Amino acid sequence: MRRQRERKSMPDAVKKVYLIHGWGANRHMFDDLMPRLPATWPVSAVDLPGHGDAPFVRPFDIAAAADGIAAQIDAPADILGWSLGGLVALYLAARHPDKVRSLCLTASFARLTADEDYPEGLAAPALGKMVGAFRSDYAKHIKQFLQLQLLHTPDADGIIGRILPDLARCGTPQALQEALDAAERADARHLLDKIDVPVLLVFGGKDAITPPRMGEYLHRRLKGSRLVVMEKAAHAPFLSHAEAFAALYRDFVEGGLR
């Protein structure tokens, strides 16, 4: 069972939202976003296997992670995935279409690394440099990562102070390594044509990890999707531009989705 932070709904709530974090993080990455979402929404932020408080059963597998979340969903839900969590969300929507009402993918990807027919991906050396820094001193570099995301954000210190203590409990080194290896190997491009739900894509114009070209690729492949690029955001638009992001997502979910 994956641990999750859950916010109960008001009695008339009809929507259920699941938030899926990215690599090297946990459910507390969404602690600043959750209070900005409508109080009538029941919201669950889940931990991926081996992250946060969730147990780790080897090996880390993207499809298995999606299946585990699907097992928690009892009616079509609105799924928001960030970075690696967006990849998990794609697998969830393709493998369990009856469990997904809509998708919001923010700073995410169908494939992370570049190849001959996918120039939108990252070059391996750039990815390796970033990951190496996190491996050497996670607590130091996750704080620096947050500081960079919130560079021009009012109350940046307050946001970091609220989420960093719980976020720093990132999971076991083995789980993080296997999750990264799985992300590097994963290729969900063959799943995109199977997805037939409303999709909102939100990317940061200054994101060097999942640059907007990855969002443009998803937009071309996911029929009926909507792409929004927040020009001054980087890899975590829901943190750096929390109010705008929350309003955008609220309008997407409550405004008919398409």
From Swiss-Prot:
Q: Which cysteines are joined by disulfide bonds?
A: none
Q: Name one GO molecular function term.
A: pimelyl-[acyl-carrier protein] methyl ester esterase activity
Name the catalytic site residues: S83 (nucleophile), D207, H235
**Keywords, A to Z?**
Biotin biosynthesis, Cytoplasm, Hydrolase, Serine esterase
- Cellular component terms (Gene Ontology): cytoplasm
User: What's the Enzyme Commission number for this chain?
Assistant: 3.1.1.85
User: What pathway is this protein a component of?
Assistant: Cofactor biosynthesis; biotin biosynthesis
Claim: Metal-binding is one of the keywords in the record: no
Q: Which domain of life is it from?
A: Bacteria
| Chain ranges of the AB hydrolase-1 domain | 17-241
Reactions mediated catalytically:
6-carboxyhexanoyl-[ACP] methyl ester + H2O = 6-carboxyhexanoyl-[ACP] + methanol + H(+)
Entry's localization field:
Cytoplasm
- Task of the protein: The physiological role of BioH is to remove the methyl group introduced by BioC when the pimeloyl moiety is complete. It allows to synthesize pimeloyl-ACP via the fatty acid synthetic pathway through the hydrolysis of the ester bonds of pimeloyl-ACP esters.
Family affiliation: Belongs to the AB hydrolase superfamily. Carboxylesterase BioH family.
Q: How does it assemble?
A: Monomer.
- Record-given protein name: Pimeloyl-[acyl-carrier protein] methyl ester esterase
Gene label: bioH
